[in-house]
């Protein structure tokens, strides 16, 4: 089993538990250059809020989009957009990535902005 398939397997296991519980998820995906965050409805078919470093609004604020500072900006923005839609409680779906570095920075910023998970 290679590194990518192991990550996908971890993510599937966590998503299965979240789907059974029927909770709104804050999903994070990262690449070496960008980080993406989405708030997904409990049924899994609707994206309630989203933010990523690909957006001009965010890339204009940060010097480099693949670091913890950029992840914190994305976390804050996705939390603000989710709160505007009335979503306050979410489950954190880290997509099999370690809770460390950019993923942790995004989660901390989202918590500070008002999301609870």
Swiss-Prot record:
Keyword Ribonucleoprotein: yes
Keywords noted in UniProt: Ribonucleoprotein, Ribosomal protein, RNA-binding, rRNA-binding
One example of a Gene Ontology biological process annotation: translation
Record-linked InterPro entries: Ribosomal_uL18_bac-type, Ribosomal_uL18_bac/euk
Gene Ontology CC, one term: cytosolic large ribosomal subunit
GO molecular function: 5S rRNA binding; structural constituent of ribosome
Pfam families registered for this protein in UniProt: Ribosomal_L18p
Stored CDD domains: Ribosomal_L18_L5e
Family to which this protein belongs: Belongs to the universal ribosomal protein uL18 family.
Function: This is one of the proteins that bind and probably mediate the attachment of the 5S RNA into the large ribosomal subunit, where it forms part of the central protuberance.
Protein name per the record: Large ribosomal subunit protein uL18
Species of the source: Actinobacillus succinogenes (strain ATCC 55618 / DSM 22257 / CCUG 43843 / 130Z)
Lineage: Bacteria, Pseudomonadati, Pseudomonadota, Gammaproteobacteria, Pasteurellales
Gene responsible for this protein: rplR
């Amino acid at each position: 089993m290679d590194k990518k398939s192991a990550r996908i397997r971890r993510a599937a296991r966590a998503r299965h538990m979240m789907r059974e519980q029927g909770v709104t998820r804050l999903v994070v995906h990262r690449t070496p250059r960008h980080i993406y965050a989405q708030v997904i409805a409990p049924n899994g078919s609707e994206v309630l809020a989203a933010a990523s470093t690909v957006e001009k609004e965010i890339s204009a604020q940060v010097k480099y989009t693949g670091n913890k500072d950029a992840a914190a900006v994305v976390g804050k923005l996705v939390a603000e957009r989710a709160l505007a839609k009335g979503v306050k409680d979410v489950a954190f779906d880290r997509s099999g990535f370690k809770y460390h570095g950019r993923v942790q920075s995004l989660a901390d910023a989202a918590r500070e902005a008002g999301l609870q998970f």
